[in-house]
């Protein structure tokens, strides 16, 4: 498998030589730690070599340099992932020396390729320009609040997995190709809010647009460009092999094509892999047998090897980094919308059989990734 992946990478070297991406673009290895505050409130503790540790400091000490955090508009079903909770997460990340990425969901709940529900507070707004202003003002006010706390993020995601049209009514949700006249107006409003605030304060913030799975990004960014959505800095991708048409060795093809076409660096802003198929609580796990790839068993070593392989491929293709989704979402007594416990403890970086002791997956942060892998 190693030779196969390296050979595929070598073929791409000529193609990625002229991506238009600056040579000084940083390469991030990070984690989405949005769940940590809630997990600790629910009684979770985290350990490294048997000793209790602060999870943010642990990730920083292990080499993580970027923390991603989601923000919901007004989630009445939980007290987490609101501005107060997000501010706490950003502060903990910055105090540990890591940079931050703020992920605006523009919803009161989860957004993803299947749903992009408008916040209840905006549901009455039918005029696109008026809705765009509400989005602009909310984005600006959020950044201003964080800035006052000296918590302004380094990167901002304008939407989360926006494969379908954003800010849709739940009872009239439309999948498939977005209404680009409306969608472009709304997305550009969010982008403009970030740009204007950055310009006003003189504080740089990179804009990320985020699509789930590389095969969707190829058509989405083409249509976005055709409809005037062009002012962004980073192409963000979710990459989960279970749900992608692209196998791991094929991923650099998509990264190279996106970077060659749009001259923007590509970052994997979500990925994950199970270290076991065992379920430790009543909440069903999202990543089960179908998530397991032949080359990477569902084991601590398999999880690490997947991450090392993925990150090397992204680096070799000229990508900007890899962020692991919710490696600290461990099992607790608390409930989600769907069950009691965690739906992700078998894909976390902590061993549920050893009181949440750190797993080998942490080694992926400090691995020596080469900018250009050579075929063997």
Curated annotation (Swiss-Prot):
Keywords: Calcium, Glycosidase, Hydrolase, Metal-binding, Signal. Binds 1 Ca(2+) ion per subunit. GO terms for biological process: pectin catabolic process. SUPFAM superfamilies: (Trans)glycosidases. Ca(2+) binds at residues 281, 285. InterPro entries: Glyco_hydro_53, Glycoside_hydrolase_SF. Changing residue 161 to A: Partial loss of activity. Belongs to the glycosyl hydrolase 53 family. It catalyses: The enzyme specifically hydrolyzes (1->4)-beta-D-galactosidic linkages in type I arabinogalactans. It comes from the Bacteria. Its cofactor is Ca(2+). Optimum temperature is 60 degrees Celsius. Optimum pH is 7.5. Its EC number is 3.2.1.89. GO terms for molecular function: arabinogalactan endo-1,4-beta-galactosidase activity; glucosidase activity; metal ion binding. Residues 1-17 form the signal peptide. This is Arabinogalactan endo-beta-1,4-galactanase. It holds the Pfam family Glyco_hydro_53. Induction: By galactan. It comes from Cellvibrio japonicus (strain Ueda107). It is an enzyme of class 3 (hydrolase). The active site is at residues 161, 270.
């Amino acid at each position: 498998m190693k030779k196969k992946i390296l050979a595929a990478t070598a073929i791409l070297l000529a193609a990625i030589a002229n991506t238009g991406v600056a040579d000084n673009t940083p390469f991030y290895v990070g984690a989405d730690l949005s769940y940590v505050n809630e997990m600790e409130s629910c009684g979770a503790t985290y350990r490294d070599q048997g000793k209790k540790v602060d999870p943010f400091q642990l990730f920083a000490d292990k080499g993580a340099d970027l923390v991603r955090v989601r923000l919901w508009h007004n989630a009445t079903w939980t007290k987490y992932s609101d501005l107060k909770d997000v501010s706490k997460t950003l502060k903990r990340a910055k105090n540990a020396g890591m940079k931050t990425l703020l992920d605006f969901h523009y919803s009161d709940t989860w957004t993803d390729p299947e749903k992009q529900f408008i916040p209840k507070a905006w549901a009455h707004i039918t005029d696109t320009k008026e809705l765009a202003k509400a989005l602009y003002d909310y984005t600006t006010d959020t950044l201003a609040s964080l800035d006052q706390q000296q918590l302004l993020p380094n990167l901002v995601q304008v939407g989360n997995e926006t494969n379908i049209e954003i800010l849709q009514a739940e009872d009239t949700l439309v999948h498939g190709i977005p209404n680009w006249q409306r969608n472009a107006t709304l997305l550009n409003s969010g982008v403009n809010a970030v740009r204007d605030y950055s310009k006003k304060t003189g504080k740089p913030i990179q804009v990320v647009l985020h699509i789930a799975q590389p095969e969707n990004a190829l058509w989405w960014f083409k249509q976005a460009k055709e409809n005037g959505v062009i002012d962004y800095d980073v192409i963000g991708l979710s990459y989960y092999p279970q749900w992608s048409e692209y196998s791991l060795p094929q991923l650099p093809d998509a990264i190279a094509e996106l970077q060659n076409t749009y001259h923007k660096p590509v970052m994997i802003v979500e990925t994950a892999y199970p270290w076991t198929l065992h379920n430790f609580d009543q909440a069903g796990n999202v990543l089960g047998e179908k998530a397991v790839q032949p080359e990477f068993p569902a084991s601590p070593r398999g999880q690490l090897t997947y991450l090392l392989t993925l990150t090397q491929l992204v680096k070799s293709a000229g990508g900007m980094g890899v962020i692991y989704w919710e490696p600290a979402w461990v099992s607790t007594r608390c409930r989600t919308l769907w069950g009691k416990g965690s739906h992700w403890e078998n894909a976390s970086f902590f061993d549920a059989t050893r009181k949440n002791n750190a797993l080998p997956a942490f080694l992926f942060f400090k691995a020596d990734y080469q900018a250009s892998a050579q075929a063997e």
